[in-house]
């Protein structure tokens, strides 16, 4: 005779409803009791249905939407590793999905949903408001990471870009006693617009006019920012005595260009980056940078999504992760 949920409930002296919720991976049962139910079911030789087997292969999908942007930087690697590590602690595996430019998002989502994920984490760094609507229509929990859109109906975990950029700019003003310059990305992602807001807020609060800032626009990678800054220096464009940069890659490329043209860092020009990548402490000179706690950010994103999966009632929230400034040797 086959073992039933009632048999398991009788052995554990709990309700059959609790057993059913656990075996069907539904909320309402503690993790400890859920584990005990599965252990007992296995000991008694319980035969799982195909649906149960599928639902108990717990899986979270992580979606990257590519345009003229590749998620290959150390920032996204550290963030993704943190998410995967946290999910494994709770018995979930992670599947990564890539939706490339010109792909039909609706069709790609249909393919993803065939894998029956319990929830989705969406890297929204380069997304637009019009693309978010596809994810609002889904019946499973979706968390938006590294972006925020008021129209999105799920949770969002973002960086406090404005305050981070403002703190970096204020540091330059305090140390250099002049209006800082800005080496900004040619991209216009929401994160970068927020960093620009923080930069300009800091210089205005210090009594400078926005037009006083010397601004250079570069392509946001180490090699491209190096090449762009070499051209700017060789054209003899005006240079500031200190700069805030949109990210560490830009800052490191700029430092290389300045040093190759005989400009000393920080004696002649001070520089601050953003992201505090692991390699930023190894460049010459070690880079002062706005630290984004990437491991913590990934953990918070994973925890919040799992909470939503387990909960019967959901109230969307926006979580802003604060930054701190790591002082090294690139500011005099």
What are the roles of these predicted feature ranges?
Residues 40, 82-86, 134, 194-207, ...:
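Alpha-helical structural signal in soluble globular domains
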Residues 117-123, 181-184, 215, 237-247, ...:
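Periplasmic-binding protein-like
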């Amino acid at each position: 005779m086959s073992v039933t949920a009632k048999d398991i409930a009788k052995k554990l002296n709990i309700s059959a409803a609790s057993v059913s919720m656990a075996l069907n991976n539904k909320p309402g049962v503690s993790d400890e009791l859920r584990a005990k139910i599965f252990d007992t079911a296995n000991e008694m030789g319980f035969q799982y249905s195909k649906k149960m087997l599928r639902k108990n292969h717990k899986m979270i999908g992580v979606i990257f939407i590519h345009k003229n942007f590749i998620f290959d930087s150390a920032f996204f690697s550290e963030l993704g590793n943190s998410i995967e590590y946290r999910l494994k602690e709770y018995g979930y595996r992670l599947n990564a999905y890539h939706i490339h430019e010109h792909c039909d998002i609706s069709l790609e989502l249909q393919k993803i949903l065939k894998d029956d994920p319990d929830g989705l984490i969406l890297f929204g760094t380069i997304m637009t408001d019009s693309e978010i609507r596809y994810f609002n229509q889904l019946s499973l929990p979706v968390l938006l990471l590294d972006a925020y859109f008021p129209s999105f109906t799920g949770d969002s975990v973002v960086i406090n870009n404005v305050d981070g950029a403002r703190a970096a700019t204020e540091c330059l003003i305090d140390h250099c006693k002049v209006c800082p310059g800005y080496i900004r990305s040619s991209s216009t992602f929401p994160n970068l617009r927020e960093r620009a807001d923080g930069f300009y807020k800091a210089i205005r609060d210090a009594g400078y006019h926005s037009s006083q800032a010397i601004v250079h626009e570069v392509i946001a990678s180490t090699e491209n920012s190096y090449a762009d800054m070499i051209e700017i220096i060789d054209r003899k464009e005006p240079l500031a005595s200190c700069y805030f940069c949109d990210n560490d890659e830009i800052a490191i490329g700029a430092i290389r260009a300045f040093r190759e043209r005989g400009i000393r860092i920080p004696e002649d020009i001070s520089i601050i980056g953003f992201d505090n990548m692991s390699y930023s402490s190894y460049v010459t000179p070690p880079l002062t940078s706005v630290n984004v706690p990437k491991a913590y950010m990934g953990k918070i994103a994973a925890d919040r999504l799992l909470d939503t999966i387990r909960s019967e009632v959901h109230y969307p929230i926006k979580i802003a992760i604060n930054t701190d400034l790591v002082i090294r040797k690139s500011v005099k």
